Amino acid sequence: MTLWINGDWITGQGERRRKTNPVSAEILWQGNDANAAQVAEACQAAREAFPRWARQPFAARQAIVEKFAALLEAHKADLTEVIARETGKPRWEAATEVTAMINKIAISIKAYHARTGEQKSELVDGAATLRHRPHGVLAVFGPYNFPGHLPNGHIVPALLAGNTLIFKPSELTPWTGETVIKLWERAGLPAGVLNLVQGGREIGQALSSLDDLDGLLFTGSASTGYQLHRQLSGQPEKILALEMGGNNPLIIEDATNMDAAVHLTLQSAFITAGQRCTCARRLLVKQGAQGDAFLARLVDVAGRLQPGRWDDDPQPFIGGLISAQAAQHVMEAWRQREALGGRTLLAPRKVKEGTSLLTPGIIELTGVADVPDEEVFGPLLNVWRYAHFDEAIRLANNTRFGLSCGLVSTDRAQFEQLLLEARAGIVNWNKPLTGAASTAPFGGVGASGNHRPSAWYAADYCAWPMASLESPELTLPATLSPGLDFSRREAV
């Protein structure tokens, strides 16, 4: 029973799928994908459930969402293990993901009232009221790198706003998706309000092409996001929120505090084995002796990072990538850059063939032409050297993406200049690129998104505004517009 449709667990009628641990190859989950008819059935269930769910008082929807938060807390250890085993990330990091899921509940409730909710302004002869209404039936596409937290960032605000949903997890993390949905079931969601369909690209296309869908909330790669944008083109009535990738620059202008700068770079580039959309992909280091020393220290410390299994003791900083194929893709990207003329500073290495364990790689590309402007989703850091700060900003903006950007410097004026000139949705100063505040919007421009940031702003794309002018009585204005004559004519 791998699908949850209209409150029932049913067997998928599509292809057989098996999920294994990307390091040990242990079988974790087996089941069948949905087929197109079951995807349509899930949408119909959501459509039928929508009117009653949307009419529920906000307090009733909030109570169910808060029950879900309590269940997350009660089952934190179990969900942590599921995420860690399925993604290959260490237990410590999977635990932080579940904590982020729990914290998302209170934040989303606050954001609903701050960003949407209801506001009233008194007028002389009545009131002006702003309300927000749910879109209807929305699809949620989840990624594999944070298979609990990132879909949660769409699902929670969408449910609070009164929408009903069809959730398709990544085909690489079906176990996490199913586990989370079982907690929603226990929280008491009415039948049809949230539905689960499993599957890969074909099921995603079947879901996104449904005529009865009111919108789609997506987190994933730019290539898939662009495909969804093309698929929904000519349908302005549908809400589309795209949270995509990045080719993010980190500028090292002043590395006087050498180890702190190296630590920030490791956190920016290699955490989650480089599988965060905000990870630094491009490291811009100022020319000179200090920059040389910084790179030498970075290579030294990064070379000691040994990826390990999810349950190793002591815990590793990074675990495996999502699959052995993903690790192979990073190796191929590194070799491609070497072939273009790049100088390897630290060669990535497969810890064991057939697994997804991969050590970090660092390659210098200063002066190399035709380097692909792409997101290599793994622990590969590209280095460019620059002569002056204006050149650093030019290099930073030399990408079609625009998600995150960072600066290591003690000069506030340089940060102010970067804030004015950077083309990115997240711009950090002496903080890792992978750090983001839940009380701020999360998203980017260019190929990183379609101006629908999530996190604190997720409430914005989960409801539409309704403006009203209201008066309990109908009265004739004391002063009429020119040309209007309401005088009583005497009967002749």
Curated annotation (Swiss-Prot):
Active-site residues per Swiss-Prot or TrEMBL entry: E243, C277
Pfam families noted in UniProt: Aldedh
Pathway: Amino-acid degradation; L-arginine degradation via AST pathway; L-glutamate and succinate from L-arginine: step 4/5
GO molecular function per UniProt: succinylglutamate-semialdehyde dehydrogenase activity
UniProt superkingdom: Bacteria
GO biological process: arginine catabolic process to glutamate; arginine catabolic process to succinate
SUPFAM superfamilies for this protein: ALDH-like (SSF53720)
Enzyme category, top tier: oxidoreductase
EC assignment: 1.2.1.71
Described purpose of this protein according to its UniProt entry: Catalyzes the NAD-dependent reduction of succinylglutamate semialdehyde into succinylglutamate.
PANTHER family xref list: ALDEHYDE DEHYDROGENASE-RELATED
NCBIfam families reported in the protein's UniProt record: arg_catab_astD, PRK09457.1
Protein's name according to its UniProt entry: N-succinylglutamate 5-semialdehyde dehydrogenase
Organism: Salmonella agona (strain SL483)
